[in-house]
Swiss-Prot record:
This is DNA-directed RNA polymerase subunit beta'. The keyword Zinc applies. One of its GO terms (cellular component) is DNA-directed RNA polymerase complex. The lineage of its organism: Bacteria, Bacillati, Actinomycetota, Actinomycetes, Micromonosporales. It is an enzyme of class 2 (transferase). The RNAP catalytic core consists of 2 alpha, 1 beta, 1 beta' and 1 omega subunit. When a sigma factor is associated with the core the holoenzyme is formed, which can initiate transcription. Its EC number is 2.7.7.6. It catalyses: RNA(n) + a ribonucleoside 5'-triphosphate = RNA(n+1) + diphosphate. Belongs to the RNA polymerase beta' chain family. The gene is rpoC. One of its GO terms (biological process) is DNA-templated transcription.
């Protein structure tokens, strides 16, 4: 069997009949499967043991040889080899076909490869293959030319003979007619009878004439056809073809069906064909040139590879191993079988019948019909339903063919190769574990015992609790008390992986140290819920056990939850106290004047706590406390900065005006952090955790988070926050406010009834009035709510809910939308607290229902987007530390603020310029170097740069990276999830795809309607992101100026025309058919620059690429994607979007091939294109000319160099067809390819750089090893606890088969 680690690339090609026979272990001759009485396979049938191997290990069919000692013997009685039964998964058979058939993929695929090769239309090809028409395969033109005169004379003689016989016959008949008429006259017959006889005679003479004429015409047609006979010519008339064959059989050959196609392919001279096509491309125009290009691709594919085009016509069909198309007995004695067996059976039946008919010498028409049926049977086996109606099984279900086995989500690629099930795993419901540390999880005892069973068994034997593995297994199954102690020992320091589906980003799988718990539910630390997007309303999670030492080390170092605090999308902490913890910390740090003990002073925090315990001091009372070990005091955002008293040094005792609660809060923060002396809400807490993440090690951060969690839960209980009906306070002046606006609305209605305004204007006015009313009522509610109101506390602290929700509950529901998404101009005046009227309730249900439908659609769409993004970026891996490029991109660091124009940090600096590498030294106004080239940009450096008055800097970017494969570390910059320089081997492409796809479900699906005809609808949310990444031409696209010039606008009846008169005096450029509704951005007489938008709308990225080049498109696309995400408040770093855009712009269309091998019009990888051109220029050749192309992510994924990756993505059959013809080789660079064939992925620790590490002992270590005194006692390490792995065969796991 092949070992995956021994090959570096995987090639796919066309198999010839010899290849198929070579793979085969025997010919399948009978359609039988298994004998219904003995249940043993029939000889020569589809399950034959002689061909495919024995059904039982080491046992032949007849039972003569049993046991392993006869290994390799072939039984002389039944012919079965004595071997393992698993060979039935590997050994193939074949069916020798009585007539050739074509492979449906190459004839029916789009484009038809056979059609392109033979230059035949697919319609004609179908007629030939399915025996509806004859085709001429070859013509001996020389012989025809030589003998044409003789042949023509022969035909002429035949025609004359035919004319003579016609004339003589007519003469004879005319004589007979005259005699008959004379006889009748003599008999005195009536005129009527005479007339009838005369007419009859004339009719017969006419028939003779016609028959003779037809004969002459046919001779003319035969001669004419023969003169013009060409190879590949179709002859649809069967009689004509037979006549041709009978008369001129030695001058041409022809036929129908796959045999004829085979003959045509054999007669082809590929080199000559390629040369003539190249000539056509050089000289041709229009459609001819395009067709020649397409044909040349196919012809060149066969020329440049070892593939023979004869592989597209099959003489024998391979039969896949029987264990891959099993047949199993059901309870009722019936059998369930794979559809493939039915399809193979049809092929064998028809093939055998055809053989018999040929042997009997049946008429051609019967044989041809059987051949057609055989062709259809093979088609159905390869790709059922591709042509005509699919073959159906019982219950009219189409049978699953070989192609269907590969295609789609349930196909081989996605179901079994990319999505395997694994052992050592389990799943259960999750509950909260508030007492756990950040890196721990609670694992139910029963589950842990099952998962760690082999480890427990080995340890029981090591500790002599059991004599052997078998008795250890029995002990575990009976759950003896000692087993639990051993389990406790085994799971210590052994991390497990927890995963919650859907795993939208890498934080969906994290490692934890298991703690044994009673019950059957897994316990989860409350802070990791955000990362998993988990809640405890019945969610389930899966547990996986990393087995090997390497896997455990990776889980502990890379995946432990306390090492995954930062989110890969933006580098912000994701383990953040939420909900009740925030309420607790808010309660703890809130300051309430007038509380018990206000104004007192305490000599230490311990004294203050004592006063609190004795009930003399309130947690929130403002007091003075003398604190030790402070490094400074933080007064909070918006407050006066704290100034230290004179002479105070860090660490000296100091009296601070604060509250006891704040002192307790600061105890959870690490020593060395400034004293936090302000109220903590969600935003402030987030800023503190951010700051801690940047300045303190992970260990300190994890401990702090645990402290915050403990404090949060504890004080949330103390705060006693509850909600009752009376806490929902309605605004006192609501009636009065609504009454006032009601009058306004009546006034508008009256004006409308008098005809003073249109319905559209009335609608707009009403919406405006009621929006104002809603806002005023909401404002009134805000002012009326007391600070102590629990709802206000929840919202103000950021724990849960927002003012909009409170407004709907307590004040007024407001305006809602109808099912079309337009706003209804009458508001719902009630709040939920008061209750809605029937009509109000009815119109408010539209929005709710639409919301639910939206969410369902959005989830599917978002998942599909992620899948496409992963596919396009999966091979972007950090391959080297620095590619050494000088190219960089400029980025804004600062922006002008206010009237004075002082420079402040740019609002989007965190998601654009942070975590990147500087490309140049940055100098201040006085010429001093503020930051050196190659420095990592963080918030401290950004502040320094902005303080030096620098507004924009040049930074390295993946868009300008020059690495041959993947990208380099310097261009990528800092790794966001670790906060350190990115490691070689990091799969940054997949991280980028996950970061963009994961928030996809939060984006809206809506295209916003303001109702009526208020301009074009703008696509937003998820559909807009898809539109950008698929590089589609946007809806309502705006034209952009091709050249700088003056604008002239011409109004037509229905549309406008914008004309740009270029500055350089070249021809005017017109943009016509611009709707009158669209707002213009350039007026008559304005001057526009190149690439400037002329109307309101979205720019077409392809136009932008053509006019302004790749750099402009990159900036435009990044901004467009960011706009959508920012509008929803989602932060994603630019670098993730840039990686996807880099993949979209990876290819070049060849315009002129120069002296390269590239064909014009083909898409080529940019790196390959540039290196090939450099090589040619250095050798003095002519380089190729190309144009950059922007490809959508689906197209880019399918155009990838790896055929395995493309085939497992979409359009499997098309990708495989194409790859086979080009004999594509997959060099296994990306991740998917390696997962498919079962190798370690070339990313992370699987990259070759780390796989080939050699450990050299130091001199010191060598000295220790070689002197026996280095050992405390001589132990050769063969004892029971030597740490050696016990071979798995020794464990009796029961059968897994």
């Amino acid at each position: 069997m092949l070992d995956v680690n021994f090959f570096d690339e995987l090639r796919i090609g066309l198999a010839t009949a010899d290849d198929i026979r070579q793979w085969s272990h025997g010919e399948v001759k009978k359609p039988e499967t298994i004998n219904y009485r003995t249940l043993k396979p029939e000889k020569d049938g589809l399950f034959c043991e002689k061909i495919f191997g024995p059904q039982r290990d080491w046992e032949c069919y007849c039972g003569k040889y049993k046991r392993v000692r006869f290994k390799g013997i072939i039984c002389e009685r039944c012919g079965v080899e004595v071997t393992r039964s698993k060979v039935r998964r590997e050994r193939m058979g074949h069916i020798e076909l009585a007539a050739s058939v074509t492979h449906i993929w190459y004839f029916k695929g789009v484009p038809s490869r056979l059609g392109y090769l033979l230059d035949l239309a697919p319609k004609d090809l179908e007629k030939i293959i399915y025996f509806a028409s004859y085709v001429v395969t070859s013509v001996d033109a020389e012989a025809r030319h030589r003998d044409l005169a003789t042949i023509e004379n022969e035909i002429l003689a035949e025609k004359r003979q035919s004319e003579n016989s016609r004339d003589s016959e007519i003469e004879k008949r005319a004589g007979k007619l005259e005699a008959d008429l004379a006889e009748l006259e003599a008999e005195g017959a009536k005129a009527d009878v005479r007339r009838k006889v005369k007419e009859g005679g004339e009719r017969e003479m006419r028939q003779i004439r016609d028959r003779a004429q037809r004969e002459i015409d046919r001779l003319d047609e035969v001669l004419d056809t023969f003169r013009k006979l060409e190879p590949k010519q179709l002859v649809t008339d069967e009689l004509l073809y037979r006549e041709l064959r009978d008369r001129f059989g030695e001058y041409f050959t022809g036929g129908m069906g796959a045999e004829a196609i085979k003959a045509l392919v054999q007669n082809m001279d590929l080199d000559a064909e390629a040369e003539s096509l190249r000539e056509t491309i050089r000289t041709g125009k229009g459609q001819r040139k395009i067709r020649a290009l397409k044909r040349l691709k196919v012809v060149a594919a066969f020329l440049n590879t070892s593939n023979s085009p004869l592989g597209m016509v099959l003489d024998c069909v391979p039969v896949i191993p029987p264990d891959l198309r099993p047949m199993v007995q059901l309870d009722g004695g019936r059998f369930a079988t794979s559809d493939l067996n039915d399809l193979y059976r049809r092929v064998i039946n028809r093939n055998n019948r055809l053989k018999r008919l040929i042997d009997l010498g049946a008429p051609e028409i019967i044989v041809n019909n059987e051949k057609r049926m055989l062709q259809e049977a093979v088609d159905a086996l390869f790709d059922n339903g591709r042509r005509g109606r699919p073959v159906t099984g019982p219950g009219n279900r189409p049978l699953k063919s070989l192609s269907d086995m590969l295609k789609g989500k349930q196909g081989r690629f996605r179901q079994n190769l990319l999505g395997k099930r694994v052992d050592y795993s389990g799943r259960s419901v999750i509950v909260v574990g508030p007492k756990l540390k950040l890196h721990q999880c609670g694992l139910p005892k029963q589950m842990a015992l099952e998962l760690f069973k082999p480890f427990v068994m080995k340890r029981l034997v090591d500790l002599n609790h059991a004599q052997n593995i078998k008795s250890a297994k029995r002990m575990v199954e009976r759950q003896r008390p000692v087993v639990w102690d051993v389990l406790e020992e085994v799971i210590g320091e052994h991390p497990v992986l927890l995963n919650r589906a859907p795993t939208l980003h890498r934080l969906g799988i994290q490692a934890f140290e298991p703690q044994l718990v009673e019950g059957k539910a897994i316990q989860i630390h409350p802070l990791v819920c955000t990362a998993f997007n988990a809640d405890f309303d019945g969610d389930q999670m899966a547990v996986h056990v990393p087995l090997s030492a390497e896997a455990q080390a990776e889980a502990r170092i890379l995946m432990l939850s306390s090492n995954n605090i930062l989110k890969p999308a933006d580098g912000k902490p994701v383990t953040m106290p939420t909900q009740d913890m925030i309420i607790g910390l808010y309660h703890l740090t809130h300051r309430t004047p007038g509380e018990r003990g206000e104004g007192r002073a305490f000599s230490s925090d311990a004294e203050a706590r004592m006063a609190f315990d004795n009930g003399e001091l309130h947690l929130q009372a403002p007091v003075k406390i003398r604190l030790r070990g402070l490094v400074g005091v933080e007064s909070g955002p918006g407050a006066e900065p704290w100034t230290a008293p004179e002479g105070w040094v860090e660490g000296d005792p100091i009296t601070v005006e604060t509250t006891l609660g704040r002192v307790l809060f600061n105890e959870t923060l690490p020593p060395g952090y400034r004293f936090v002396n302000y109220e903590i809400r969600k935003g402030q807490l987030s800023a503190i955790v951010n700051d801690l993440a940047e300045r303190f090690p992970k260990v300190a951060l994890a401990a702090t988070l645990d402290g915050l969690k403990e404090a949060g839960f504890h004080w949330a209980t103390w705060s006693g926050v509850t909600i009752g009906m009376e806490d929902v306070l309605a605004p006192p002046r609501k009636r009065e406010i609504l009454g006032r606006y009601e009058k306004e609305a009546d006034r508008i209605d009256k004006q409308y009834q008098r005809g003073l305004m249109t319905a559209e204007e009335r609608r707009g006015e009403l919406i405006e009035i009621w929006t104002k009313a809603t806002n005023e009522v909401a404002k009134e509610m805000d002012t009326a709510l007391p600070q102590e109101n629990p709802l206000w506390k929840m919202i103000n602290s950021g724990a849960r809910g927002n003012l909009l929700q409170l407004r709907q509950i307590a004040a007024i529901r407001g305006l809602v939308a109808n099912p079309k998404g337009e706003i209804i101009p009458r508001p719902i005046k009630a709040s939920y607290r008061e209750g809605l009227s029937v009509l109000e309730y009815f119109i408010s249900t539209h929005g709710a229902r639409k919301g639910l439908a939206d969410t369902a659609l959005r989830t599917a769409d978002s998942g599909y987007l992620t899948r496409r993004l992963v596919d396009v970026s999966q091979d972007v891996i950090i391959r080297e530390e620095d590619c050494g490029t000088d190219r960089a991109i400029p980025m804004q660091v600062g922006q002008q603020a206010g009237e004075a124009g002082s420079l402040v940090v740019h609002e989007h600096a965190e998601t654009s310029v942070h975590a990147r590498t500087l490309a140049d030294d940055i100098k201040g106004p006085d010429g001093t170097v503020v930051a050196e080239r190659g420095a990592d940009i963080n918030s401290i450096l950004v502040d320094k740069i902005v303080a030096a008055g620098v507004e924009s800097v040049r930074v390295r970017s993946v868009l300008t990276c020059e690495s041959k494969l993947g990208v380099c570390g310097a261009c990528y910059g800092r790794s966001l999830p670790t906060g350190k320089t990115v490691d070689v081997g990091e799969a940054v492409g997949i991280i980028a795809a996950q970061s963009i796809g994961e928030p996809g479900t939060q984006l809206t699906m809506r295209t916003f309607h303001t109702g009526g005809v208020a301009g074009e609808d703008i696509t937003q949310g998820l559909p807009r992101v898809q539109e950008i990444f698929e590089a589609r031409i946007p809806k309502g696209k705006a034209p952009i100026a091709d050249t700088p010039g003056r604008v002239r606008i011409e109004d037509g009846e229905r549309s406008r025309k914008i004309i740009v008169v270029p500055d350089d005096g070249s021809d005017e450029i017109a943009y016509d058919k611009i709707s009158k509704r669209v707002r213009l951005l350039a007026n008559d007489g304005d001057h526009v620059e190149v690439g400037e938008r002329l109307t309101v709308g979205t720019i077409d990225p392809h136009e932008l690429l053509r006019i302004l080049g790749p750099r402009a498109v990159q900036v435009h696309l990044t901004q467009e994607v960011q706009e959508v995400y920012r509008s929803q408040g989602v932060l994603i770093h630019d670098k993730h979007i840039e990686i996807i855009i880099r993949q979209m712009l990876k290819r070049v269309t060849v315009i002129d091939s120069g002296s390269t091998e590239f064909l014009p019009g083909v898409l080529v990888d940019r790196a390959l294109f540039e290196s090939e051109n450099r090589r040619l220029v250095s050798e003095g050749g002519e380089p190729a000319a190309g144009r950059p192309v922007l490809m959508g992510i689906t197209k880019a994924s399918l155009a990838t160099d790896s055929w395995l990756s493309a085939a497992s993505f979409q359009e499997t059959t098309r990708v495989l067809t194409d790859a086979a013809i080009h004999a594509r080789s997959d060099s296994l660079i990306g991740l998917k390819e390696n997962v498919i064939i079962g190798k370690l992925i070339p990313a992370g620790t699987g990259i070759s750089k780390y796989r080939n590490v050699r450990v050299e002992p130091t001199e010191e270590a060598k000295a220790k090893v070689y002197s026996m005194t280095g050992y405390p006692e001589t132990d050769y390490g063969f004892g029971p606890a030597s740490g050696q792995a016990v071979p798995l065969d020794d464990f009796d796991f029961g059968s897994y088969r």
